[in-house]
Regions:
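Amphipathic alpha-helical interaction segments
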Residues: 16, 25, 44, 49, ...
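Acidic, low-complexity, intrinsically disordered interaction modules
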Residues: 38-58
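Short, compact, well-ordered microdomains
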Residues: 55-91
Length: 91
């Protein structure tokens, strides 16, 4: 598995400003966590998405950082403990 964080410098509240990815050996996302400026963490697992290149996903405005498994698991665990989606707006 490969682990990445993509970070964008924008103020849009309805777009994630951080994206944490777990990619399998083919480059397909298996788990991801979207982080929004309002403090909402949106974990997604059991993904069925095509292979992706984190640098392409970041575009010209994003920064890509390689993570290790422990770092990704820490973020994943945090995201599972926090309210998400609509309920996250109230915390």
């Amino acid at each position: 598995m490969q682990y990445y964080m993509i970070e964008w410098d924008h103020e849009e509240e309805d777009e994630p400003w951080k994206l944490y990815l777990e990619l399998d050996s083919r480059g397909c996302p298996r788990r991801k966590v979207e982080v929004y400026r309002v403090g909402v963490y949106q974990p997604c697992d059991d993904l069925d998405e095509p292979p992706m290149d984190p640098r392409e996903a970041a575009g010209s405005e994003g920064n890509v950082t390689a993570l290790n498994r422990v770092q990704f698991e820490d973020i994943w665990d945090q995201s599972r403990q926090m309210p998400d989606g609509f309920m996250g707006m109230f915390f």
